[in-house]
Amino acid sequence: MFMQSSKVYRFTICLAAALILLSGSSLSIAAAAKPSSSSPAVSSYDVVVIGSEIQGVLLAKEAVKAGLKVLMLDPRSKLGGELIQGQMFFLDDVNDNKQRSLVQGEIKNLFNGYKAGTIRKAADFQTYFDKVIQGIPLKSGVVLDHVDIKTAGSGKTLSSLTYHGKEGNKVTIQSRYWVENTDYNALSSQLKEARIPGMETIYNGKNPDYMAATYMLNFKNVDWNLLHQRILEDYPLTNVRKKYGPNTYVDWHFATGFSNITNTYTTKDKQLRLRGLNATYQKNGQVIINGLLIYDVNPSDPKSVASAVQRGQAEAPFILSFLRKNIPGFAKAELNGFPEYLYIRDYNRYETKYVLDYPDLMNSRMFWDNVSIGGYSIDLQGTRAIPTGIGYGKPDRYGLPLRSFELKSYDNVLVTGKNVGASIKAYGSARIMPTTALAAQTIGIILGRERNKPLANLTEADFKRIRAYLKQDYQIVLQ
């Protein structure tokens, strides 16, 4: 009997062990089938802005002020784009045909400081930019890996975006609205929207063409008083322009023109051209000039950008020597450092719900959904095919509708800055920074204050109300 009990005992022990093993195995299988609790949840936002150009920063700032959940992702490693990294410190004013300024909104603070002389040097612009971008959650140096697009009927929604940062970990996020705010279509180029024809249409070219980029030139030891004096000695202004070229003008702060002189300069590098000068006096003998054009730059290709920057730096000493001999006040000038980036004035633009056209500008058309007012001359800068560029007149004030900043096929993708939906002639005016900056800020305000209604559903009656609070609360007038 003892032996039988012993067998039963051993059988019981073995059965229990087997059950434990089976139980453990089934637990392991269940654990494998169940998602790991450590898997990161997908973060959701109200607004995600791609890129840190000043326009999108202003949009994001207003959204943050309104309490929306915002994230800025910059594919560039350094912030500020054209304004900060490209050092585009010659600011173009925008006026109507009665010479009334059309610069409004937050960007007016930058222009006021610029005109007053308190914002002229790189450190001044950096201080302004830092103040505006403060409080906006951001990550720089990211790579956009994948976009998830949902289709509903004839429309599309950008559902989610996956990116990775310097550490390499992939992150997927969702957002109610996405904003293209780079100068090379980092986001919109992935969304399969039709490209708006560009500079090639001016001369019936077959391949896409773009206005030249600019490499800004910094100088020191410039005698600005002498430059001013010499130009005054050649007055009246008609004589100045006959001698130095159209649009030549010098005051205590700014200088433009001198194309009769610069046209005699031949660049060492045939990809470059020295056009007429737009110069800002930064005080203490320091001057920055917008005048060196670089053709065929692809801002989406880091190698193309790096090559253009190197070409600009290599040409600068020869330009310095030329200016010393030919422009009053530059006899003892020296180079004063180099920007790390370019002023990209034109790249691909994709169709929006309304594409602004040349007749809209020249007929001073106002739209029911205006988000900005433009008025800059229609200025198409040079390409290899049209080296000197071409102008198409000066419009009076005209409107830019919200629909020109909404990607055509999408209900939740916005564009800012030089991504504005405009035909190439209209773009020659609409591209100017204070015009697109006002549009971006206005859109940011609307996103916050109209958060309970999709932008696509806003009506003419809504915009009548919107215009009222923009005027009262922000001193922004859009008619």
What are the language-model segments listed below?
Residues 56:
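N-terminal Rossmann-fold NAD(P) dinucleotide-binding loop
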Residues 148-172:
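Conserved beta-strand-loop-beta-strand element in the redox core of flavoprotein oxidoreductases
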Residues 169, 177, 184-186, 192-477:
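Flavin (FAD/FMN)-binding glycine-rich loop and adjacent Rossmann-like elements that form
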Residues 24-36:
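Sec-dependent signal peptide cleavage junction
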